[in-house]
Structures are given as structure tokens and as C-alpha cells.
């Protein structure tokens, strides 16, 4: 899978933060996004996630059927292909006589997707906020499975998957605890676990190690390394840990303003 930005312009209230941005990122890459506070890292990540509209340009995904989120293939592949056609894209898809998509390669206009469709492609971890949902840790992490509710994964398998995510993120012992009873660092790890449970090809993280001690920070970075290099996700991390970025990231993007 490739995630391509073509002359992308992003910013606040119609005011661009940077000149047009053009680059291509790929599955299996761990990308560090660095820059001073206020440089636009968070704005860029939220634009990539579709939480903020871009001002101009395109965000395109080039992928094959085997790399598509399973729920996309089972639920609304035709709506995605149709939207690409309407937006002038070039979906390289064919249909069999039964109506199934048989050709492997697609080019998808990411910005044309609905929020539900985007949620199967990209998940994002934002900095913690004072607002705390009246839910337990387990319930919050289970929310990550909502975009895949039409997938073929059985309820039992989904439960096993969520349980494995809780263990991988080091919060299994907190599963029944209400969110309001957690520290800021624990809440941050819960939101990371929710994004991991969403199981998307693209994972965006905005300062995911805020409020974490040294040991917890190293564990999070190790998890991100595994997600990128072993599970072949595209992982983009906004961080101030410059030593880690230089040592571990496959690519470093610096925003200068």
C-alpha cells in the first residue's frame, strides 16, 4: 500500500501553514514527524485522518484487494470504487459475473471517503483531554472494533483480539477500571490500545508518549516498531523524542515554519 499526498495544502481557517506538500509513504514504514510546538504537526495529522479538511490537493491510497481492510471488502467496496470514479480517480477494478471485485489494484481518493470508510483505513491517537468518557477501559478499547462490525470476524475472535491488544499495550490489568479512575498516562495508553484495536493499515499518533515514564515510553516505541515492521502498517508519529526518531524511524519529516 502507498499513501500519496499530491500538492496537499493544510492549515487553520483557510490559512495555509506550509507550501504544497507532495510525498509518498508506504506500508511497513515507521515515520517520525518532528518540529517545534505550533509548527503544524497536529494539524497535518488531523488532516491526514480526515478530522480537518484539506485546503487543496489530493490524498490518494494505492493498494491491492489483499491489503484492504476486510470490512471494506465485505461491506462497501462498490461505494468506494464509485466515489473514486466520480472524483476522476482510476480504480483498476473489474467485476466478475457474480458482481465480485476480481482485479487486485485500486487507486482511492482518500478525501472522498465517508467517515465510516476512512475509519477502516486510518486510526489516530490524539493527546489526552480533560473529557473522560463514562466507560471502562475494556469498553473504550472495544470501540476500536466498531468500524469493522460488518466483517467476518466472529464475536469470539473479536473478543480474543481485543484481549490481545490489552496485553500488548500493557493495560490488561486495567480492563474493568473506569476511565475517570486512571492517570493521564494510563488514559494515553488506553487510547493507543483503542487505535490498535481498530486495526487499520495507517496509524497516526500525536505525541503518544505524553505523560508516560521512561519504561512505558520505551514499551510504546517498541510496539510501534512491531506494528510497522512486523505487521506492515504505515505508522506516522509526531514526537519530540529526536534521538528515537533518528535511531528508529525509517523516514523523518520535519516541519519548519
Where are the regions that the model predicts?
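Helix-to-loop junction immediately C-terminal to a conserved catalytic motif
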Residues: 49
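Conserved ABC ATPase signature
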Residues: 178-182
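Catalytic Walker B motif of ABC-type/P-loop ATPase nucleotide-binding domains
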Residues: 203-206
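Conserved ABC ATPase "signature" region
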Residues: 142, 156-174
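H-loop (His-switch) and adjacent beta-strand-loop-beta switch element
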Residues: 251-257
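The feature captures the beta-strand-to-loop junction immediately N-terminal to the Walker
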Residues: 34-36
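H-loop/switch region of ABC-family ATPase nucleotide-binding domains
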Residues: 239-240
